[in-house]
Amino acid sequence: MQLELLNDQGLATAKYEAPETVFGRAYNEDLVHQIVVAFQANARQGTRAQKDREQVKHSTKKPFKQKGTGRARAGMTSSPLWRGGGRIFPNMPDENFTQKINKKMYRAGMASILSQLAREGRLAVVDSMKVDSPKTKPLAAKFKAMNLESVLVIADEVDENLYLASRNLVNVLVVEPRYADPVSLVHYRKVIVTKAAMEKLQEMFA
């Protein structure tokens, strides 16, 4: 699979030969969906909580007499039928949303995503992504010159300058290969990978 090798202006100056084992696989939509959903589920904190009728702090006094008012009978204001009452099936903080994906499936799914990005022209290679200072403005100008509005940058090493320069940019995420995840790969319109990071991706997902 041949990928575009971009310069600082976003122009393709050469071709980068990527191995078919990682960047030339068939797209497996079911597998990609499975690893994306599993990644999102595993990222959940599981701390959301609501109260049932027992946990809501309300008086147990009967709100009005049983008969003679014309209203539906009511026992206490903590009933789920009442405003401010407890939930019938509340979310509990001890819920476990973890989904297990074995390593072989995960590697195959990531390779499938990378292959599809390459076929769609959304994956490109650059020599490096070094910046001289932690200033955001020069890096933003560089991405603008390359016509990149929504971009995931996978760099072999994210030093302090690159991290500080990129963290305040909208629709820009800079990560090292080990932190590349399926959700980010499918979310951003363009994925830019440095040459050294390409070698690491090949080792990880071959």
Curated annotation (Swiss-Prot):
Single GO molecular-function term?
Answer: structural constituent of ribosome
Under InterPro entries, the record lists: Ribosomal_uL4 (IPR002136), Ribosomal_uL4-like (IPR013005), Ribosomal_uL4_dom_sf (IPR023574)
Annotated region (Disordered) at 46-77
Indicate, by first and last residue, each region the UniProt record lists as having compositional bias (Basic residues).
58-70
Q: Which domain of life is it from?
A: Bacteria
- Keyword terms of this UniProt record: Ribonucleoprotein, Ribosomal protein, RNA-binding, rRNA-binding
* GO annotation, biological process: translation
Alphabetical GO CC annotations of the entry are: ribonucleoprotein complex; ribosome
**RNA-binding found in the keyword field:** yes
Job description of the protein: One of the primary rRNA binding proteins, this protein initially binds near the 5'-end of the 23S rRNA. It is important during the early stages of 50S assembly. It makes multiple contacts with different domains of the 23S rRNA in the assembled 50S subunit and ribosome. Forms part of the polypeptide exit tunnel.
The entry describes its oligomerization and partners as: Part of the 50S ribosomal subunit.
Q: Which family does it belong to?
A: Belongs to the universal ribosomal protein uL4 family.
What is the recorded name of this protein?
A: Large ribosomal subunit protein uL4
